[in-house]
Regions:
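Class I S-adenosyl-L-methionine
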Residues: 1-71
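RNA substrate-binding interface of SAM-dependent RNA methyltransferases
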Residues: 1-15, 79-80, 84-94, 103, ...
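Short hydrophobic/aromatic-enriched beta-strand-loop microsegments
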Residues: 13-20, 70-71, 91-97, 142-148
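Small/polar loops that bind or transfer phosphate-bearing groups
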Residues: 19-20, 44, 73-74, 97, ...
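Short, well-ordered secondary-structure micro-motifs
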Residues: 29, 54, 82-84, 106-110, ...
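A contiguous loop/helix-start segment that scaffolds small-molecule binding in enzyme catalytic cores
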Residues: 39-40, 117-118, 122-183
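Class I SAM-dependent methyltransferase SAM-binding "motif I" and its flanking Rossmann-like core
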Residues: 58-115
Length: 183
């Protein structure tokens, strides 16, 4: 989608193959076979860094298991700018990514109630209020958090305050964009 537009813009005509959570187990073997036969492969992501709340880990691990060295280029991931811009101490932090949707969500949050490191979560707009309400119940309505959206894009925004304050803001304003929540 976005990657193809970028490649076209720079006149790069390398063939693209989709690699996503629904096909990565099937595709990873093909990727390894191509590399072992001498082809060069690049794993790119439409938004963020492969393997960070995106498919990619399985491909990297399988390559390493087959003695294929992987070169990782530094690139964008929303968690670092959101963390730095949060105003919350981040000497030690833990990346949680997306919380489980149903099974295991409550258990995961219960385990995190005693976490003393800064926590980083990803969330989609249609689940943001539910997640914030879950945070209020698990971590307390007065807990200071930061919510960033659309990192490095035109409508980038970071809101800081208590969980309760941010819930009130998004109750009146429909959430848009992809979110990074720092707790």
């Amino acid at each position: 989608r976005r990657s193809k537009k970028l490649l076209i813009y720079y006149n790069i005509d390398t063939p693209l193959r989709s690699h996503h959570k629904f096909n990565e187990h099937k595709e990873v073997g093909k990727v390894v076979d191509k590399i072992l036969s001498g082809e060069k492969i690049a794993l790119i992501s439409d938004a963020g860094t492969p393997g960070i709340s995106d498919p990619g880990f399985l491909a990297v691990r399988t390559c390493l298991e087959n003695n294929i060295e992987v070169e990782c280029l530094p690139g964008a991931t929303a968690l670092v700018p959101a963390l730095v811009n949060s105003g919350i101490p981040f000497e030690r932090f833990v990346f949680e990514g997306f919380l489980p949707v149903k099974k295991g969500r409550k258990t995961r949050l219960e385990k995190l109630t005693n976490e003393d490191r800064t926590m980083i979560f990803y969330e989609s707009p249609h689940k943001l209020l539910k997640t914030l309400n879950d945070f209020s119940n698990s971590f307390g309505a007065d807990r200071k958090i930061s919510v960033s959206r659309e990192i490095t894009k035109i409508y980038e925004e970071t809101i800081r305050g208590s969980v309760e304050h941010i819930i009130n803001l998004f109750t009146d304003k429909i959430p848009k964009g992809e979110f990074v929540i720092i707790v």
